[in-house]
Curated annotation (Swiss-Prot):
It comes from Porphyromonas gingivalis (strain ATCC BAA-308 / W83). NCBIfam families: L17 (TIGR00059). One of its GO terms (molecular function) is structural constituent of ribosome. The keyword Ribosomal protein applies. The lineage of its organism: Bacteria, Pseudomonadati, Bacteroidota, Bacteroidia, Bacteroidales. The gene is rplQ. InterPro entries: Ribosomal_bL17, Ribosomal_bL17_CS, Ribosomal_bL17_sf. Residues 129-140 have a biased composition (Basic residues). Keywords: Ribonucleoprotein, Ribosomal protein. Residues 128-160 are annotated as: Disordered. This is Large ribosomal subunit protein bL17. Part of the 50S ribosomal subunit. Contacts protein L32.
Length: 160
């Protein structure tokens, strides 16, 4: 029976789990990316996503609810300032989990959890991929072949 299995208890009592998720959520908002285990990242995603949805409307009530989750006024300021502006048009899915491998000591699955709109590497690659065309690749490869052929013939003429 699946009784009391709605969320991962993470091997902790309720107060410890709430404090840990609150601290991890504040760190995620302040640093935009944190390194943790996959189980904690999945629990954090369930904890943070509704919180990020609440920040779309900046009211005193939503700020108080968010503060009850975070207990960190610096994270709250960052959340309602910079983060809320970036996620305003996104309908959900504010976090991304990138699995990195296994921890050396206990072989626990490790990962990065990050805010989607703050990964400059992935955003930059998407922009670069959109600008490339197939025709430009053919031209570059043709230019390289044309330049390489005369360079090989010149040393042979010098040897004779």
């Amino acid at each position: 029976m699946r009784h009391n299995k709605k969320f991962n208890h993470l091997g902790r009592k309720a107060a410890h789990r709430k404090a840990m998720l609150s601290n991890m959520a504040a760190s995620l908002i302040l640093h935009k990316r944190i390194f943790t285990t996959v189980a904690k990242a999945k629990a954090l995603r369930i904890y943070v996503e509704p919180l990020l949805t609440k920040t779309k409307e900046d009211t005193t009530h939503s700020r108080r609810i968010a503060f009850s989750y975070l207990q960190n006024k610096y994270a709250l300021k960052e959340l309602f300032g910079d983060v809320a502006a970036k996620i305003a048009d996104r309908p959900g899915g504010y976090t991304r989990i990138l699995k990195t491998g296994y921890r050396l000591g206990d072989n626990a699955a490790m990962c990065f959890i990050e805010l989607v709109d703050y990964n400059e590497n992935m955003l930059g690659e998407a922009a670069k991929k959109a600008t490339k065309t197939r025709r430009s690749r053919k031209r570059k490869s043709a230019d390289v072949v044309v330049e390489a052929a005369p360079a090989e013939e010149t040393p042979k003429a010098a040897e004779e």
